Amino acid sequence: GGDNAILDAIVAQLRHIDPDLPICALSRTPKETRAAACVDSLYTFRLLAIRRRMRHAKLYLSGGGTLIQDTTSTRSLLYYLSSIRMAARAGCRVMLYGCGIGPVSRPRNCERTAKTLNRYAEIISLRDRYSEETLRALGVTTPEIHLTADPALLIDPGDTPAIRSFLHHSGLAEGTRYALFALRPWKDFDRHIAAFANAAEYAHREYGLTPVLYAMEPCRDRAALNAVAAQLRCPYLLLEAGSNGTEIVALIRRMSLVIAMRLHTLIFAAGQGVPIVGVVYDPKVSGFLDYLGQDLYLPLEEASAASLCDLIDTAMAEQMFEAENIRSLRELDAENEE
């Protein structure tokens, strides 16, 4: 899903710098990653093999995405901090690349994060101001810090026969317009199922947009989308993201509107100039949208049929995603290469 698309974007930037650069990605599914991204790959938890590879590498990139946070778990945070430490000790230069930071809320985790990043990271490029503020609050001052943009904004799926074939086989019909809903399970999500279903029906009734219920992370998101689908009384598609980042972005580009909780769905839509409505379950979502100058979002707990329909009206009326806004973000993202 989104992780594969991020990797595709990072690999493309690195290949732009040096087409022959050997790249090794850490992955939970290394066989799939090798095939999809055309890079070498090691299993995320093969620590001895990773350490051996690091001794022969010059640079360790941590990112994109939001890896330095303890919302998921302290264990997840400790893994990413320890990988940074291990890379530096193996002789790699360390860069956190086009990433989000935070929230880091537990006091002990704040100390660990500041200590590790101050000691081992050389450069940190961030995708939003919220992350910059989080680093400042943590006391991270030693690395060079640059506010750039998410690497995923640079993905260009093109308009190849393969892309057209993929869209056709996904069930997207020529001449039909679509509104994509990228939702995920979260605390009290069940209380808002009817609101999302009503909003999807509204988009269909008022604007002729067929709802696409899109599982960016299929294993996690499927149940939430099925619950919304069960309440729909209009035609819809239920689709799942595959492992090809270019195809994910091509599908999102085909949409007339995107309503999403999933951050990278919003990032991909913004990069393609598709109008977006954000539903915020985590500060990283509002942080990105604020950085974009985009105010069409609301917290999940305030998601009602009326509020969602109002935002849909505004997004459809503005029909912006200002090309100038996107261009400036892409220019910022190019700074990741520098």
Residues of each region from the PLM?
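Active-site anion-handling motifs in enzyme catalytic cores
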Residues: 1-338
